[in-house]
């Protein structure tokens, strides 16, 4: 690529709408690295002859980060949606053999090509909304071959689409049918066979567990965390979504990157998160879709200064959501978060939830030029509009990878 000065733009370099530069420019060298940014009037003379790209007054933010997804799976769970509308709870469906286990059956039956094609279709709407980094979990295979298949597909998505993919091994997502009544034996399999094999193949960036009364106990979760720690892998946790099981405090003891969901999180757990530097990842899509009523403790998270991220939690059972912008709106309308909070929740705090705050979530000299250009009058519109296409252009590594076609 040619060294380029992107200009005629309004810059929000750190995802905070109160920290902006009008009539700004970004200079990107031939490696796709930002070498200068600031007011156009202060552009150094050394960049005067570089190629120019006019963004026509668009707002520019860091590329968005979707830090919690289950994008790779087989089938749908539309039938369970009808059950929930009839009053059957998520927990009841799971106990009847539906829920996660029904997706496990469909995922095991699908080959890699089928899973890739289906996941690619789910990924593309996110890319068109300015997402340049995404986390993708396994957890719908629940045996070594199927978990490997899922993680391989996630890696392939990162190789074939203009997005950085971070993989999370979620083998401890649910108890597979063949281990019914033998949860400890399944955790043996996760810790002693699945995780070592997948880590040795370079398929795992982090490790997650579903710690809940319909998932895995604190003791079982800790065993997985110990196995991950021995491998030098960071951990994260699905915690306190349906009850307060104390998982967040355990996650904090292992300095987890994030604890996610958190509707039933208490102040002691929040204090532990703050001390450990663990990010709170809130998932309003799941809250909305399964009609939860227990709100995450936003005020307590604010009080203790715990960074809050937002994510789609895209999955077939509780959040079939393919819009990070709608997630922003939900964060504001359902959780009463502010516009600065939700914007930072999908930029720098989301990057921190992946342990990648040094690479994503901000536009600074020395970083890769990953950014999105928005056709809005104010950044509040990113959380305001519902369903309107707002992203005009996405740049990754200094190269345009998406441009909205008008007319």
From Swiss-Prot:
Residues annotated to bind 4-imidazolone-5-propanoate: 77, 140, 173, 241, 318
GO CC annotation: cytoplasm
Keywords associated with the record: Cytoplasm, Histidine metabolism, Hydrolase, Iron, Metal-binding, Zinc
EC nos: 3.5.2.7
Claim: Magnesium is one of the keywords in the record: no
Catalytic activity: 4-imidazolone-5-propanoate + H2O = N-formimidoyl-L-glutamate
Disulphides: none
GO-annotated biological processes: L-histidine catabolic process to glutamate and formamide; L-histidine catabolic process to glutamate and formate
Pathway: Amino-acid degradation; L-histidine degradation into L-glutamate; N-formimidoyl-L-glutamate from L-histidine: step 3/3
Binding site for Fe(3+): 68, 70, 238, 313
Cofactor note: Binds 1 zinc or iron ion per subunit.
GO molecular function: imidazolonepropionase activity; iron ion binding; zinc ion binding
Chain ranges passing through the membrane: none
Cell compartments where the protein resides: Cytoplasm
Coarse class of the protein's main subcellular location: cytoplasm
Residues binding N-formimidoyl-L-glutamate: 140, 315, 317
Keyword presence, Metal-binding: yes
Binding site for Zn(2+): 68, 70, 238, 313
Pfam families: Amidohydro_1
Coiled-coil regions listed: none
Job description of the protein: Catalyzes the hydrolytic cleavage of the carbon-nitrogen bond in imidazolone-5-propanoate to yield N-formimidoyl-L-glutamate. It is the third step in the universal histidine degradation pathway.
Similarity annotation: Belongs to the metallo-dependent hydrolases superfamily. HutI family.
Database matches in NCBIfam families: hutI (TIGR01224)
Name used for this protein in its record: Imidazolonepropionase
Species in which this protein is naturally found: Burkholderia lata (strain ATCC 17760 / DSM 23089 / LMG 22485 / NCIMB 9086 / R18194 / 383)
Encoding gene, per UniProt annotation: hutI
């Amino acid at each position: 690529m040619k060294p380029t000065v992107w200009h005629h733009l309004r810059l929000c370099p750190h995802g905070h709408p109160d920290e902006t530069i009008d009539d700004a420019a970004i200079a990107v060298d031939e490696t796709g690295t930002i070498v200068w940014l600031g007011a156009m009037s202060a552009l150094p003379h050394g960049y005067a002859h570089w190629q120019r790209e006019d963004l026509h007054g668009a707002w520019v933010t860091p590329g968005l980060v979707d830090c919690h997804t289950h994008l790779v799976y087989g089938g749908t769970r539309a039938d369970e949606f009808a059950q929930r509308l009839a009053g059957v709870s998520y927990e009841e469906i799971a106990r009847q053999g539906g829920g996660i286990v029904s997706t496990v059956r469909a995922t095991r039956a699908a080959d890699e090509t089928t899973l890739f094609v289906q996941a690619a279709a789910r990924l593309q709407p996110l890319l068109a909304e300015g997402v340049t980094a995404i986390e993708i979990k396994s957890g719908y295979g629940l045996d070594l071959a199927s978990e490997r298949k899922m993680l391989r597909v996630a890696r392939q998505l990162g190789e074939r689409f203009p997005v950085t993919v971070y993989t999370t091994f979620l083998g401890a997502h649910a108890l597979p049918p063949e281990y019914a009544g033998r949860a400890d034996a399944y955790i043996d399999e996760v810790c002693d066979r699945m995780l070592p094999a997948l880590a040795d193949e370079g398929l795992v960036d982090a490790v997650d567990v579903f710690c809940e009364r319909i998932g895995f106990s604190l003791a079982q979760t800790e065993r997985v965390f110990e196995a991950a720690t021995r491998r030098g892998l960071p951990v994260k946790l699905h915690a306190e979504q349906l009850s307060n099981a104390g998982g967040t405090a355990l996650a904090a003891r292992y300095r987890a990157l994030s604890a996610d969901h958190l509707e039933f999180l208490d102040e002691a757990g929040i204090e532990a998160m703050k001390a450990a530097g663990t990010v709170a990842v809130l998932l309003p899509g799941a809250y909305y879709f399964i009609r939860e009523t227990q709100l995450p403790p936003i005020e307590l998270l604010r009080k203790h200064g715990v960074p809050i991220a937002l994510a789609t939690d895209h999955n077939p059972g509780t959040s079939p959501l393919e819009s990070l912008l709608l997630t922003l709106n939900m964060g504001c309308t359902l959780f009463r978060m502010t516009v600065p909070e939700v914007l930072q929740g999908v930029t720098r705090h989301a990057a921190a939830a992946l342990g990648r705050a040094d690479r994503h979530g901000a536009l600074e000299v020395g970083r890769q030029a990953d950014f999105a250009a928005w056709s809005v009058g104010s950044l509040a519109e990113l959380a305001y509009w519902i369903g309107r296409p707002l992203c005009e252009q996405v740049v990754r590594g200094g190269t345009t990878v998406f441009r909205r076609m008008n007319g």
